[in-house]
Amino acid sequence: MNKAKVKLDKDLLKASSTMTDHQARFLVDTYYQMQNARIRSSAQVRGLEEEAEPSEVMTWVDEINLSLEENIKKALGKYALGHPIGKWSMGIKGIGPVISSGLLAYVDITKAPTVGHIWRFAGQDPTSVWNKGEKRPWNVNLKTLRW
């Protein structure tokens, strides 16, 4: 079966570099949602293949999910490359467009006088305690990026 493709056109890709941090946060979250959808659909396709029940529609859904995930990653790459810190961070081994964009979108460096403030905001401070009835002392989406 031919690979299904959803192509991100040049105008949308160009617009990705001018997204606001708020818009980038939504796109990072969407990337992780699409990744989960792709993982689920791939598992379903494998399960159907093991039972010798090929499903062209399910395979198509899996391919579309993969294509959407790849296009969102490209858009996030354009966003990250539109910022000097994004370019720098993508040059570090292990940090790609999604993590770089997530850090740019979630971390406001003007509100973090030290790296410890960023660690705490990302849920990395072992002394942080989340008691019942209190607001969570870290950003759950930023904490997801650290994985």
Show the residue positions of the predicted features:
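Conserved aromatic-histidine-acidic binding/catalytic patches
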Residues: H22, F26-D29, W60, G91-I92, ...
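Helix-hairpin-helix/helix-loop-helix acidic hairpins
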Residues: S42-V98
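Phosphate-backbone recognition surface of nucleic-acid-processing proteins
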Residues: W88-S89, G102-W147
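Generic recognition of short, well-ordered alpha-helical interface segments
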Residues: D29, N36, S67, P137, ...
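Phosphate- and other anionic-substrate recognition elements at nucleic-acid/protein interfaces
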Residues: M1-G47
